[in-house]
Design a protein with these regions (language model features):
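Active-site-proximal helix/loop segments of hydrolytic enzymes
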Residues: 13-196
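Short glycine-rich His-centered loop
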Residues: 1-15
Length: 196
């Protein structure tokens, strides 16, 4: 579960902390992964696990580290918030299993697209604080080499930004239980496919 109570991430259009979105989606992903026969270890569910090294240590022995988040945009871009929507997936080339991370991220992105979701493109834009090159443009996967969790994990690692919650319409979609279930199912199907 991305973020924690003391640092809850971005605040959505309607004022809900990102951590709440992350927790709901992570629980749904867990259910779908278990339904697909995979074992899941939830990390950060109580909102008190602060340090990245504690999170990756808690994941020791896992085949894949998924970090569930919801997206925003740089502060100077907030007046254009309604332009930003879609999912993004991030991997680090500094992860010791970068090729497997990319394979898993691509599988998750393909499953999200098959479920009707659209990848966000703005992280690849040449603007301050972004400029994250595509690793797999079709499936919304970006390289983010200095991503803390991506570098720290000792197993393949994918950070999922499920949607842009500063966008009013996208926040409403992320709050829709049917949409959340579709996203969670797609993440689980992609993860299962890459772990075969």
């Amino acid at each position: 579960v991305g973020h924690y109570h003391a640092e809850p991430g971005v605040i959505s259009y309607s004022g809900i902390p990102e951590f709440e979105f992350n927790l709901r989606l992570a629980r749904e992903v867990k259910t779908h992964l278990e339904t697909n026969g995979l074992q899941v270890r939830m990390i950060g569910e109580r909102g008190n696990l602060i340090f990245l090294n504690h999170r990756t240590r808690a994941a020791q022995g896992a085949d894949l580290f998924l970090s569930i988040h919801h997206d925003s945009a740089r502060e100077y871009l907030l007046p254009r918030r309604e332009e930003f929507a879609g999912f993004s997936l991030f991997i680090s080339r500094h992860n010791p299993h970068a090729a497997k991370s990319l394979a898993c991220a691509s599988a998750i992105g393909a499953a999200l697209r098959a479920a009707g979701m659209t990848p966000s493109r703005y992280h690849a834009d040449p603007v301050i604080g972004e400029n994250r090159p595509f690793a797999d443009e079709l499936n919304g996967v970006h390289f983010y080499d200095n991503l803390g969790i991506g570098k720290a994990a000792k197993m393949p690692s994918v950070l999922v930004e499920a949607g842009v919650i500063i966008n009013r319409e996208e926040e409403a979609r992320m709050n829709d239980p049917a949409v959340r279930a579709r996203i969670a199912d797609a993440i689980a199907r992609g993860a299962k496919q890459c772990l075969k």
